[in-house]
């Protein structure tokens, strides 16, 4: 995992923790900052290939961290997500 991907994972985890849903690609571009939504999507696909996140392409706000993703980010999952695992 690259430093940019680690930061992306941490930002997604913090966003989920604070709001209870995932950020959009445009929000990730603003929060990190990244140069484009395609850069965000590429890095999310890499995190998915590492087994750290899941999402449904083409569907808004379906990005979720896996148990391994939460552990890697060093952040406890929100209570509602922990009870679903």
Annotate each language-model stretch with its function.
Residues 48-58:
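A short, conserved structural fragment
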Residues 7-14:
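Pre-recognition alpha-helix immediately N-terminal to the DNA-recognition helix
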């Amino acid at each position: 995992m690259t430093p940019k991907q680690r930061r992306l994972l941490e930002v997604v985890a913090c966003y989920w923790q604070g709001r209870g849903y995932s950020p959009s690609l445009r929000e990730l571009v603003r929060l990190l900052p990244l140069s484009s939504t395609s850069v965000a999507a590429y890095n999310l696909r890499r995190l998915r290939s590492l087994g750290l996140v899941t999402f449904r392409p083409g569907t808004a706000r379906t990005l979720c961290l896996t148990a391994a993703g939460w552990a890697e980010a060093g952040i406890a999952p929100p209570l509602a997500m922990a009870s679903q695992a």
